[in-house]
Amino acid sequence: MESLKEPVATVSAQIDRTHYRTLIKTDNHSFISDEPVTIGGADTGPSPQELLLASLGSCTAITLRMYIDRKMWIVESIKVNVELFEIEGATLIERQLSFEGELSDEQKKRLVQIADACPIHKMLTGKIVIETGLT
């Protein structure tokens, strides 16, 4: 896919001999990802699955906040809960939204639609191509 040479985001993940603690670096941040103790990790950071859900949850919350602010609706807080399930060989992600503020039922229905417009939602539900190579 030669036309996709300008990255939107770049992340590196590096792991040494410590099971399964992984150093994640972005342009401006670094943090740890790990696996739970039950599968051999030390639980020193979120698991890869939790990071994926965090991406969807934070993107959803940010998208909703931008929309709510543009509409000048009175909303004190937005909470997005995201859960991952594996059912019969398929992956299911459930996302629940809750709002603290003055919203009508119609506004809440609109916000459910807006949640589906967040870039990470679109990415996860759209066509994804992953190319793996060596450096």
Which residues does each PLM region occupy?
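Extended beta-strand/beta-hairpin segments
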Residues: 1-53, 65-135
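Alpha-helical metal-binding/catalytic segments enriched in His/Glu/Asp
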Residues: 56-60
